Amino acid sequence: MFLDELPEFGPRVLEVLRQPIEDKIVTISRAQGTLTFPANFQLIAAMNPCPCGYYGDAVKPCTCSAGTITKYQKRISGPLLDRIDIHIEVPRVAYEKLSDQRLGEPSAVLQARVETARQRQRERFTEKRASHGPSANQGATQLDCQITCNADMRPAEVRQFCQLDDTGRSLMKSAMSQLQLSARAYHRVLKLARTIADLAGAEQIAPAHLAEALQYRPRGVGG
């Protein structure tokens, strides 16, 4: 689902997204009762940095006051931002880049890399289910069957499949303090780092994979 001009949506509309993003279900309550539906989707959103759109621009000055910018950005709550794994600032594109005739990496190559990473994840969780065996706890096995990709991992799977070396643990410890990461953000960063490692074809999460995952977090949002 793509939401353009994210701050222009009403606060109640945006806050309703928190449950389906986190739990992949949506609950509707009416006088006659409550119904729960599956809501497994990928959220992509875009927004300007301020109402005029030029806050932080290197060429055109912003015409908004500091208070206006703060009020505009606060339309999106910290808990909602905390549930979005990848935050990217898109600066003005220079003429030289727009007119460059060199082609980037072909989409077919990117697609193949993603498909390989997803296959790696499916095999990882299939092996985990097989290791339980028929005598494993039935409830746990049913939950495991729902996991097909890194995004579906719960804390137990994160601890098993997202282990860090000493350098990675030191980096994560510093990031928890400097970026004020919540417990939710901690697990989301590790899952994203595991995906970055899978895309690189790496068996273990390297510090570089973790550093890339951390740079996608919004600054100052801890949940």
Please name every model-derived segment:
Residues R12-G223:
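Basic, amphipathic alpha-helical bundle interface domains used for macromolecular binding and assembly
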Residues M1-F2, I88:
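Hydrophobic positions in the central parallel beta-sheet of the AAA+
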Residues D4-E5, V16:
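Walker B catalytic acidic pair
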